[in-house]
Amino acid sequence: MLYEAYRQIHFKIIMDGSSSSITIVPLQYADIDECARITATAFSTDRHTIVKQLGEKPFNMFEVSRDGFRASLSKTTCVHVKAVNQKGHIVGHAGWGFRGIEENKIPWRHPDDEPPADQIRIIPEGRTHNESSNNKDQSSAAKETNEMGQIDHLHALEDADMVSTMNEIMPPGTSCMYITGLIVAPQYQSRGVGGALIEHGNSIADRLNIFTWVHSSDQAWRAYRKFGFEIFKELSLDLDKYAPSRPGKEWMTKLEGTGEGVTEEKWGSYVIRYMKRHPKFHDE
């Protein structure tokens, strides 16, 4: 029964000091670029992302997000939604992957539109970010660390940690959900949008009676904890060990007031938290 993705879900939130509402509906191909822009903007002040872009081969967050949507929007094991305000503007989006669940129980809906000609998939069909990481052999990942720059070592460290964690939390035979992304436009953060998206996913997990896990940024973990997620593993990173240069006045000024704690001399430490939520009324 495909229940959640076929109906509009309404949430009350606080907008500009007064009560307002958002509607959560399935993502369409026409929404991809806007959602990718929201992702890129949201991560533009994340010091972990900034440091990783200082390598010899910096990545473009807009392109990474856009390509991820293109690869997974038509997959029946991935559900993507958008949060829309009363003016029709997208204020956030979220996605969930499903493991070990019968496809007829996954609340997936084919997009109402078709991908434009310029949105040809450039990522092999059937591979999301999490799944492609899970398919990488750990020994191969270790070999790739030879003769790499510090940023490349950081990427390799995180990739290996992700593979190890995924093998631990969802070995063959596991039934679960995992959050592939949950982003709120910066100007709408701390107004209930993120909580509404988390609750939407939680309701799906509760109906299916499965656990959900997430690889959380240093900024988002408190929000997940508020909605029932608990930390089961952490990866602590000394960003100054990997950064090829100090933040300097430029980045210190740009990140002032963001809560990132960057100084002119130090990027600081950053903690990636793996978090898990059990469904309500589970028997464990």
Model regions and ranges:
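A short beta-loop-alpha structural element at the N-terminal edge
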Residues: T23-R37
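Helix-loop element at the rim of GNAT/NAT acetyltransferase active sites that forms part
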Residues: R37-E56, A71-S72, E103
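Conserved GNAT-fold acetyl-CoA-binding loop/helix
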Residues: D46-D67, W108, D113-I123, T128
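Active-site rim helix/loop that mediates acceptor-substrate recognition in acyltransferases
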Residues: Q53-H80, N85, N167-E168
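Conserved acyl-donor/pantetheine-binding loop and adjacent beta-alpha core of acyl/acetyltransferases
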Residues: I90, G95-I183, Q189, S236-Y274, ...
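Conserved acyl-CoA
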Residues: E168-T174, A196-T212
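Conserved acetyl-CoA-binding loop-helix of GNAT-fold acetyltransferases
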Residues: V184, S190-S203, K226
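Conserved active-site alpha-helix within GNAT-family acetyltransferase domains
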Residues: G195, R207-N209, D218-D238
